[in-house]
């Protein structure tokens, strides 16, 4: 047996004909075992137990005679999840290094399996599984680069995506060929003759994990029997959720989101582990499952990512060789979620981020009905469902919550889902139901705290929002400057509420003085923190944003000659931050009206200057808040008369842009929001007009601190409109 593994690791190079049938079978089962261990380890991270997962990988590597490829990938996936959940430089660097190692190991393992002609699947050629591990490593590595929100890193990521794409094309050709072969009578005959679900009768056995008929000697080999039994047992436990130490998931399965549903329980609980999905197939070979789910996830994410890349770096797409189809990409990611493994878990996390995350990939105001595709097979998810998955997404999340009860990551996703539905109080109640100090993964701990802080801000509970945001300083290394600035802006809003008389009562003067002091210290101190914590060796986009804002405040202080620093802060800065995190789409009428009051009624020396740039921000935010409250025509009028004339003119039927630099995020955003008004006012008849505004938004784009974030939102909306024109 070790002759095969020596060949794979370069210690020897026997010809394929030199390998005995028994050695080949042992190798195939050992590889299936190693892949099952890797899948189990990666599931631990989905249950907030990354350390146990990493230890499992290390222990298996120390005892397994197999190669290290899938172990390196699994470690890279765990580190990738930790990195993208926390965006901390050291964690991202570590994940990048591990994924780069997995890329190289995958290429070597694939080449050697091809050379030795070791076929581990009844469907695919030798080495296909390592083509998938290579693709997965490349894709995750590229995503780390894209998440930097840097144009340079984004361009580098495209080259890595190209590698993943070309490998995926090779695998897809093999999958398509295998699909045709699966339908043939010859293949069905071979399957019936050579494989079945794991069966041990006396001293003979067969296994789906072995893609050929065993010899009589192999059927009676106890070592092979034990290894095949172990692989089957590992797979069965994983599919039933019995592999990571939790009680049966069926007892925790709910029918709705929200803290209230947590209280509902059955008096009768089963101790038997059951499959939660009809899609789970215990009799599917581990390698085939890994290949199918991996290709669906990787090619799906790849297409969605490429479809979202903003025009600022879109010119480089030609290097990749194709333009992604968001629709097809989403379908593939949805397919991956049907598999009970890490690919399904990552796919679901990606979908939840896409539909319910803070970056408006699917703006709820752009509720254009999707056209049905009558030519689509009934097994495929149609366009309306892709646009608004509704109960399907909820059910998938609730299943994950049941399978991984120890992970606050899935609780976070549930809170985001509630928040998107405008159920802000329920979202906070759910986040309050867990003590963040008990969460093992500090990245998830930080996400929980940050989500709670921002949700409290959307509810206008600014004091508690500030206090919660400041907790981030002790648990996250991402951006101490932003956390401090955000908290300072919250205290500023509390101070202004007392100034406006919205808040009053006992100890009002004392509280007002406290909020004033906290706001002054935190807002202006935040700028001094920039540069101490860097992301990918660069200053974070939002750090650059707050630097520019604090500089503005200081300039106004010189203009108004006031001894009070807070007099130099014009339009409510917390309302800018609310926009960046999609907060207005989550507010109820109560919060929207409070925001409107803050934006339009508060006065101080800087606001009284009626500085054109400050007025531009105020009018833009006011217009979209009015739209959310149903005053669409009033909001559109403000945008048309007060904002857009400062950004462009039409001369000889051609658009001429008035380039401004004071608040660069505002200008393309104004065109984007105007497109939304066209849709809201005119419906389907306004789509061509909306499309024109979105083109203008793209054309006004430039490389500024939030260009990637704003650009992706504009691109997503433009594609959505183009699908319906």
Curated annotation (Swiss-Prot):
Instruction: Give a Gene Ontology cellular component term annotated to this protein.
Output: nucleus
Compartments reported by the entry: Cytoplasm; Nucleus
Q: Does the keyword NADP apply?
A: no
Q: Which UniProt keywords apply?
A: Cytoplasm, Nucleus, Phosphoprotein
**Alphabetized Pfam families for the sequence:** Iml2-TPR_39 (PF10300)
Top-rank taxon of the source lineage equals: Eukaryota
- UniProt xrefs under InterPro entries: Iml2/TPR_39
Ranges that cross the membrane: none
Q: What does this protein do?
A: Inclusion body (IB) resident protein that interacts strongly with lipid droplet (LD) proteins. Involved in LD-mediated IB clearing after protein folding stress, probably by enabling access to the IBs of an LD-stored soluble sterol derivative that acts as a chaperone in inclusion clearing.
Oligomeric state and interaction partners are given as: Interacts with lipid droplet proteins.
Family, per the entry?
Belongs to the IML2 family.
Question: Under what name is this protein listed?
Answer: Inclusion body clearance protein IML2
Provenance organism: Kluyveromyces lactis (strain ATCC 8585 / CBS 2359 / DSM 70799 / NBRC 1267 / NRRL Y-1140 / WM37)
The protein's gene is named IML2
């Amino acid at each position: 047996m070790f002759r095969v593994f020596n060949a794979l690791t370069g210690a020897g190079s026997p010809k394929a004909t030199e390998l005995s049938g028994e050695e080949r079978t042992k190798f195939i089962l050992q590889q299936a075992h190693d892949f099952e261990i890797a899948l189990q380890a990666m599931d631990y991270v989905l249950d907030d137990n990354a350390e146990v997962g990493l230890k499992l990988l290390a222990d298996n590597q120390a005892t397994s005679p197999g190669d290290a490829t899938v172990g390196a990938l699994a470690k890279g996936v765990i580190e990738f999840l930790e990195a993208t959940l926390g965006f901390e430089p050291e964690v991202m660097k570590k994940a990048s290094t591990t994924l780069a190692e997995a890329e190289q190991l995958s290429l070597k393992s694939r080449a050697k399996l091809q050379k030795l002609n070791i076929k581990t699947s009844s469907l695919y050629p030798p080495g296909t599984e390592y083509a998938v591990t290579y693709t997965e490593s490349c894709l995750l590595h590229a995503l780390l680069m894209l998440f930097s929100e840097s144009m340079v890193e984004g361009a580098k990521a495209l080259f890595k995506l190209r590698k993943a794409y070309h490998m995926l094309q090779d695998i897809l050709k093999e999958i398509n060929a295998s699909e045709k072969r699966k339908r043939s009578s010859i293949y069905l005959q071979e399957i019936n003759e050579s494989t079945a679900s794991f069966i041990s009768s006396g001293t003979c056995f067969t296994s789906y994990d072995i893609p050929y008929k065993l010899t009589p000697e192999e059927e009676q080999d106890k070592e092979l029997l034990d290894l095949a039994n172990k692989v089957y047992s590992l797979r069965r436990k994983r599919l039933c959720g019995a592999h990571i130490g939790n009680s049966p998931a069926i007892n925790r399965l709910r029918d709705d989101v929200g803290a209230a549903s947590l209280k509902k329980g059955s008096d009768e609980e089963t101790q038997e582990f059951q499959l939660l999905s009809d899609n789970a197939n215990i009799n599917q070979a581990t390698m085939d499952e890994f290949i199918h789910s991996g290709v669906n996830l990787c090619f799906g994410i790849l297409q969605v990512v490429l479809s979202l890349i903003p025009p600022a770096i879109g010119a480089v797409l030609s290097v990749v060789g194709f333009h992604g189809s968001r629709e097809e990409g989403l379908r593939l990611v949805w397919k991956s979620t049907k598999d009970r493994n890490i690919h399904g878990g990552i796919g679901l996390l990606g979908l939840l981020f896409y539909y319910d995350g803070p970056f408006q990939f699917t703006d709820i105001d752009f509720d254009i009905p999707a056209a049905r595709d009558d030519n689509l097979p009934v097994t495929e998810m149609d366009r309306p469902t892709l646009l608004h998955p509704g109960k399907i997404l909820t059910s998938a999340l609730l299943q994950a919550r049941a399978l991984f009860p120890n992970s606050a990551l899935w609780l976070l996703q549930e809170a985001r889902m509630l928040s998107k539905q405008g159920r802000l109080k329920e979202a906070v109640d759910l986040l309050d139901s867990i003590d963040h100090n008990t969460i093992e993964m500090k990245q998830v701990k930080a996400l929980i705290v940050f989500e709670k802080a921002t949700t409290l801000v959307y509810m206008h509970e600014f004091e508690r929002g500030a206090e919660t945001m400041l907790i981030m300083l002790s648990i996250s290394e991402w951006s101490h400057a932003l956390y401090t600035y955000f908290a300072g802006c919250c205290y500023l809003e509390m101070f202004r509420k007392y100034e406006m008389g919205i808040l009053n009562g006992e100890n009002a003067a004392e509280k007002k003085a406290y909020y004033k002091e906290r706001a002054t210290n935190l807002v202006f101190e935040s700028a001094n923190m920039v540069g101490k914590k860097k992301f990918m060796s660069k200053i974070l986009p939002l750090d650059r944003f707050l630097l520019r804002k604090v500089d503005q405040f200081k300039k106004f202080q010189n203009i108004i000659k006031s001894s009070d620093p807070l007099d130099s802060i014009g339009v409510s800065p917390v309302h800018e931050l609310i926009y960046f995190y999609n907060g207005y789409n989550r507010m109820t009428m109560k919060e929207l009206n409070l925001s409107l009051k803050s934006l339009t009624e508060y006065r101080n020396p800087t606001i009284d200057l009626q500085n054109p740039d400050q007025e531009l921000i105020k009018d833009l935010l006011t217009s979209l808040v009015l739209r959310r409250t149903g005053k669409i025509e009033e909001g559109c009028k403000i945008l048309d008369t007060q904002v857009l004339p400062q950004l462009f003119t039409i001369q000889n039927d051609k658009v001429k842009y008035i380039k401004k630099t004071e608040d660069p995020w505002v200008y393309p955003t104004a065109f984007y929001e105007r497109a939304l008004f066209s849709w809201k006012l005119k419906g389907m008849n306004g789509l061509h007009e909306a499309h024109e505004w979105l083109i203008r938004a793209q054309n006004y784009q430039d490389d500024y601190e939030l260009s990637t974030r704003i650009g992706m939102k504009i691109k997503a909306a433009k594609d959505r409109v183009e699908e319906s024109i």
